[in-house]
């Protein structure tokens, strides 16, 4: 589908969801395109397996609706050619070595995943091979083959992560550095962020700049104001708001993300940021500061129904809600409007070209009474 048609379709779908629940006039500003339509992803997680039962080793992505079959996917339009060259190099090496992949049923085997990350601004690349501990195998020869690749970027680190969990997910039980270092820095709107293989970070770096610039525009001035960034992840939005704010407090349930947020804030010299690890529902009662502005950037399923009234009870003048799932946003907007807020404007940001996903940013304002009426009551 033509990219402009994709944008029109996404904007239309989101607007319909919003129009169905928004009760007042509001401005829908359409959709902002991703700066890159192809090759925009900065992270890929590949899985070892086979394309069919007892077939040759494959390294790629799961077939649609399949837990077991793997498709080797070089030529994917969502990443640049460096990913394909790394994928093919590792696949060919492991095929020659005859190493077994980890079987989900028997829980036996060695090879599990290949994780590749690339910094868009610097070209730094991290490669992480994830295996079980069921075998010992030297990765020195593979490291030499990777170093010899003709890449547009440059390999900053080649890592080996061990994961003996039975779950089909990348878990870091122990990581060794085979080559280089275990991190790089990515640049975003003038700030730098330390990225490790397991960092939480938007997968479209240039699209993230569009998204966060939009959020910053919607928020307006933060001078001398206290900002709550709820569901803050690695604190990207909080840090972008911090330079002129009185204070920014981020709350995030994933402790590793909070640690990264604190490290990045320190690296960027932002002393007015505070990051708290915990569930928003439980933590918010213990925060002594009162916000002037609230930013909401929840997971796909939206905000816990018990947390939302607590958040809204602060009665701040403005809330900016960033959503990666418009149907969850629409559901939450019903409650938000019930508690005295109205939608001023909204727009979409296409972070995921060639897919059906899109981000939505909404600005909400607290409705204040127009005035008051004095009533004199006389009792006879």
Say what each PLM segment does.
Residues 101-108, 227:
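Short helix/loop segment immediately N-terminal to the Walker
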């Amino acid at each position: 589908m033509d990219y402009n048609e994709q944008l029109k379709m996404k904007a239309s779908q989101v607007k319909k969801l919003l129009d169905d629940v928004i009760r007042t006039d509001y401005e829908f500003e359409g959709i902002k395109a991703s700066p890159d339509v192809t090759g925009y992803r900065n992270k890929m997680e590949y899985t070892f397996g086979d394309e069919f039962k007892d077939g040759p080793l494959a390294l790629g992505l799961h077939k649609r609706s399949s837990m077991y079959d793997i498709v080797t996917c070089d030529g994917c339009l969502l990443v640049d050619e460096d990913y394909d060259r790394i994928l093919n190099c590792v696949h060919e090496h492991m095929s020659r070595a005859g190493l077994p992949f980890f079987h989900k049923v028997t829980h036996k085997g060695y090879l599990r995943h290949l994780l590749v990350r690339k910094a868009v601004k610097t070209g730094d690349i991290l490669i992480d091979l994830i295996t079980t501990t069921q075998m010992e195998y030297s990765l020195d020869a593979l490291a030499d083959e990777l170093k010899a690749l003709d890449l547009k970027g440059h390999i900053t680190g080649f890592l080996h992560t061990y994961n003996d969990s039975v779950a089909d997910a990348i878990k870091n039980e122990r990581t060794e550095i085979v080559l280089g270092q275990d991190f790089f820095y990515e640049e975003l709107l003038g700030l730098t962020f330390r990225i490790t293989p397991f960092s939480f970070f938007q997968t479209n770096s240039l699209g993230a700049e569009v998204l966060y610039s939009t959020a910053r525009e919607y928020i307006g001035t933060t001078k001398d104001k206290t900002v709550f960034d709820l569901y803050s992840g690695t604190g990207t939005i909080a840090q972008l708001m911090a330079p002129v704010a009185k204070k920014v407090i981020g709350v995030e349930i994933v402790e590793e993300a909070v640690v990264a947020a604190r490290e990045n804030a320190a690296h960027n010299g932002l002393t007015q940021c505070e990051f708290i690890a915990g569930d928003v529902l439980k933590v918010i009662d213990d925060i002594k500061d009162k916000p002037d502005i609230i930013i909401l950037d929840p997971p796909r399923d939206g905000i816990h129904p018990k947390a939302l009234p607590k958040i809204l009870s602060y009665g701040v003048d403005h809330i900016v809600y960033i959503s990666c799932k418009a149907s969850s946003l629409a559901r939450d907007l019903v409650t938000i409007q019930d508690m005295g807020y109205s939608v001023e404007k909204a727009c979409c940001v296409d972070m995921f070209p060639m897919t059906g996903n899109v981000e939505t940013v909404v600005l909400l304002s607290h409705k204040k009474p127009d005035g008051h009426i004095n009533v004199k009551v006389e009792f006879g």
